[in-house]
């Protein structure tokens, strides 16, 4: 296996990575954005290019792998499962975000969950893990979606806009927008991880056939991604990580620091890109509970190819 130094001297490989516009400027692109900023892809001899398909909703990322728009794609696990069961040979080759924290944030006049009855609540894809966790959170407070007027809005930035314009009484927000909103007087009603078990949120996906034919490129990518996760945890690189969050999201450095403090000690980020099969199984269980999948539920191993992680010494969790 080539080392980082010898790889850099080898032939450069172009690698196209599809990402939805809603993810591109969000915290969920941190591992990729940091790897770009720190030259980790370049060190592995990769000409790494982020591609944002137009139109480019999160549900279209697997399609980008099939129409030759991209080689790899950032995708939430439910979308990957649905695509694979519909005939795609797309599989997860590495994890990007494990167990996300989505906050249900409301306008200042909403003092408690019950105050949302009859009001417009912006929600993510109804078949996705965010909406599932919000339904569970509502249930903890004796409520259901039937008590609300739901509006599907893709991406934390767009949902925050709905909240600030007064068109939504509450919305689920990721970081750092949830912390930003709270600093501006909006109210935290609850968080996703109060209501659901830990699960595997987003992964890097590739077509199984393409990855097998381009193993060297995939291994280089996985090695760079693992280095990015190590950089995130390196105290000496804290400034670079904070600056990356600031550049991605437009928040102040102090707020970016709060995001990292929130994630410290939690299972939000993989340590090296390892795939949490138990967390993936939990996603499949969510999908079964909501009627998207029928019994017997498929095993998570059906939707992953671990060989590229194993090639760089990373085992599944």
How would you describe each model-predicted region?
Residues 11-154, 159-165, 169-175, 188-192, ...:
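Short, glycine-/small- and polar/acidic-enriched structural segments
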Residues 157-248:
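Pocket-lining segment of extracytoplasmic ligand-binding domains
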Residues 284-317:
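Conserved C-terminal helix/tail region of periplasmic/extracytoplasmic solute-binding proteins
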């Amino acid at each position: 296996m080539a080392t980082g130094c010898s790889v850099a001297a080898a032939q450069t490989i172009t690698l196209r990575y599809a990402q939805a516009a809603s993810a591109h400027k969000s915290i969920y692109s941190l591992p990729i954005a940091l790897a770009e900023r720190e030259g980790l892809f370049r060190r592995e001899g990769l000409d790494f290019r982020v591609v944002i398909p137009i139109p480019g909703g999160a549900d279209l990322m697997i399609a980008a792998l099939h129409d030759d728009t991209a080689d790899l794609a950032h995708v939430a696990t439910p979308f990957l499962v649905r695509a694979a069961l519909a005939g795609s040979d797309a599989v997860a080759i590495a994890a990007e975000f494990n167990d996300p924290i989505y906050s249900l944030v409301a306008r200042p006049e909403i003092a408690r969950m019950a105050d949302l009855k009859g009001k417009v609540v912006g929600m993510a894809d109804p078949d996705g893990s965010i909406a599932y966790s919000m339904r569970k959170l509502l249930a903890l407070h004796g409520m259901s979606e039937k008590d609300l007027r739901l509006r599907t809005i893709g991406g934390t930035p767009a949902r925050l806009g709905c909240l600030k314009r007064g068109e939504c009484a509450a919305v689920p927000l990721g970081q750092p927008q949830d912390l930003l909103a709270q600093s501006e007087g909006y109210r935290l009603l609850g968080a996703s991880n109060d209501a659901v078990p830990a699960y595997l949120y987003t992964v890097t996906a590739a077509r199984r056939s393409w990855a097998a034919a381009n193993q060297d490129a995939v291994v280089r990518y996985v090695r760079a991604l693992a280095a990015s996760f190590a950089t995130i945890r390196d105290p000496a690189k804290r400034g670079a990580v904070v600056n990356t969050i600031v550049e991605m999201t437009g928040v102040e450095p102090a707020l970016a620091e709060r995001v990292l403090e929130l994630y410290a000690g939690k299972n939000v980020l993989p340590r090296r890109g390892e795939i949490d099969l138990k967390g993936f199984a939990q996603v499949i269980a969510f999908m079964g509970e909501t009627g998207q999948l029928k019994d017997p539920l498929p095993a998570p191993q059906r939707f992953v190819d671990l060989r590229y992680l194993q090639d760089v010494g990373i085992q599944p969790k």
